[in-house]
């Protein structure tokens, strides 16, 4: 890590191989609940309410293929799907992380997924939201976590009728209906 600072011993970060990489979704054009006809009531979704109060649903059948979704708008955020734990984390992007573009890194730290930022070439703990290998400009930075709810599409829409949701048309050649 030439020219970078480390918050952990570099030898504790291990290459996990290309199977841990998945292409991120960058600023997908979110749909309204009414436009999301591809979802059925019992589909599993991860839901968040961002800092502006907007509800967003991340269907498991889509996020499992991408692992990282960067959402722009009033309250920029990054959603991270953890394949091992079958869970999702969400972080607000602000200050020095506002323009970060996160993606899967194919690295593990303490057995957990590490994400990378394409802008600063830094490595981050997906679990804690802290940089592991970083520029000095990121010294002391920690991403602010948002609560995430795992539920069904029907339950999420009932609680958040104005929710937005990831589109099935992502620009990637995937059959999201089969998962």
Give a label for each model feature:
Residues 1-179:
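Mid-to-C-terminal functional-domain signal that highlights helix-capping/loop sites
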């Amino acid at each position: 890590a030439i020219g970078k600072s480390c918050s952990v011993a570099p030898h504790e970060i291990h290459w996990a191989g290309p199977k841990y990489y998945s292409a991120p979704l960058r600023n997908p054009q979110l749909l309204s609940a009414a436009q999301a006809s591809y979802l059925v009531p019992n589909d599993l979704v991860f839901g968040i309410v961002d800092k502006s109060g907007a509800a967003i649903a991340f269907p498991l059948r889509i996020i499992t293929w991408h692992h990282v979704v960067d959402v722009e708008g009033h309250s920029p955020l990054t959603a991270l799907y953890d394949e091992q734990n079958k869970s999702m984390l969400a972080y607000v992007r602000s200050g020095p992380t506002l323009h970060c573009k996160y993606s899967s890194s194919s690295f593990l730290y303490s057995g957990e997924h590490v994400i990378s930022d394409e802008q600063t070439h830094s490595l981050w703990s997906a679990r804690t939201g802290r940089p592991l290998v970083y520029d000095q400009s990121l010294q002391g930075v920690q991403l602010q976590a948002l609560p995430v709810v795992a539920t069904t599409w029907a339950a999420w829409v009932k609680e958040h009728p104005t929710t937005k949701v990831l589109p099935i048309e992502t620009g990637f050649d995937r059959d999201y209906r089969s998962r």
